[in-house]
Amino acid sequence: MTKVWGGGDRVGIRLSPLTKFADIGDSNPEPVYMSLIEQINPYKLSYIHVIEGDTGGDRNPAGSFDLQKLRHAFNGLYMANNNYTLELAIEAREKNLADLICFGRPFISNPDLVARLRTGASLTPPDPNTFYAGEAHGYIDYPAL
């Protein structure tokens, strides 16, 4: 990918070290992912996008490992994701736990998410039954403020 896009500074990778989604979990993920980081560092990727916890679920599942260890081993930006609220995002940034915070699912049901976060407006919950359905319903029909 780095050759196709003209260098690692234009490429990132998404990692889900603690997810159980689709039975892809590992009983001991820390050595696997620390080794992966060691292997990808020479490519000078721009970022790692890390799903912290179980995808779309528990942020601190049993068997967790210190994701900050993963962050500090990587030689690029650390993008954190998974059920972040505005408060959690602010705390993570203030404590320098991540370089960037992702709000995946809230963007689906809140096309104006940034404005809602800035003004303290309530968020429209997404309808997971419409995820990956291939239809406009549930993706582009949520109201904006």
Could you describe each region identified by the protein language model?
Residues 2-145:
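Flavin-dependent oxidoreductase catalytic cores
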